[in-house]
Amino acid sequence: QLLFDILPYISILDPACGSGAFLVAAMKTLINLYSAIIGKIEFLNDINLKTWLVEIHKKHASINYFIKKSIITDNLFGVDIMEEATEIAKLRLFLALVASATSVDELEPLPNIDFNIMPGNSLIGLLKVDNKTFEESLDLVTQSYYHTYAEKLEERNRLLDTYRHASSYADDLRALRDNIEKKSNEVRGTLDRLLLDEFDKLGIKYEEATWDEKKNKEGKPKKRALRMDDLKRLKPFHWGFEFSEIIGKRGGFNAIVTNPPWEIFKPNGKEFFEEYSELVSKKKMSIKEFEKEQGKLLKDKDILKAWLAYLSEYPHVSEFYRNATQYKNQISIVNGKKAGTDINLYKIFTEQCFNLMSKYGECGIVIPSGIYTDLGTKRLREILFEESLVTGL
């Protein structure tokens, strides 16, 4: 049962996967499980297990390579907002796989994991989408020829399964990948519109930063309705669609392992202006020195334009983190007052992990000790220590 019904369906996620270090570590853990089982098969009187092992040896020159490839294909998933990081993560898994081969004869085609390790914003996107909501978002003309959302998901999952378990580099495989991407983009467009509607229902506006020429400082922001291009820049990742088999049918991921960013979500002037001045990049720079250098840089119209555009990307996202239902535990009430107005990304990631995890799933997350004491993390602490079982600190 463990070999055939459990291990192939274990789903492990890193929602801030970076270069894939935690995914490689997860792979090694599963390898140990497989190795222990295979080591016992020859001592058991189970004809099914022995037949399985004989067939594996017939089809694959290296059983170690086969096991690693199966784990990478069926068990490991990752998302990162930086596309370059996801490419490095895939490469890292490929290198770990190839390292198990002792000769060229043991090598097989690399696993197809373009839809396992994906770029996107893990914190912004739809967790679940029901068929009715999806259909209602389409106009009548589109509805007349458009497959239902459920049909789209079923078709995509079927194609994904074919793609992931294909064993060649043939042109038809590349065509299959392109076809999956094309069909996925059609659905993503509708999901983006639904997400934009969600921002609108929350009363979130785009606050465009301005510059007061007379006072030579930032002016009052101009508020307007959020547009699709504003949303696209956030790189939304719709979990309920991209991993519908896991989120929808299995109820979430079995395990989540991650080391999310520990930083306050707000504009960082020094970080921004480092790109334009060597002085700013110096480690020992006083606040007054920085402000003086910043003032000089902002006299350049192009730099000023870039700075205002940079500032404009924060307010609507902050409002989403504060008001979205999926992040309802970010603000705590202490003595009748709201506590914890600062938005720290590790807090957002912590709650998102709970959203993505299955009912009996487990999560290993690297977070600062402040979660034990900060007033603003009261609700998160209650989730961790009262609604969950903490097995290690």
What role is predicted for each listed range?
Residues Q1-G376, L380, F385, L389:
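SAM-dependent methyltransferase catalytic region
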Residues T391-L393:
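Class I S-adenosyl-L-methionine
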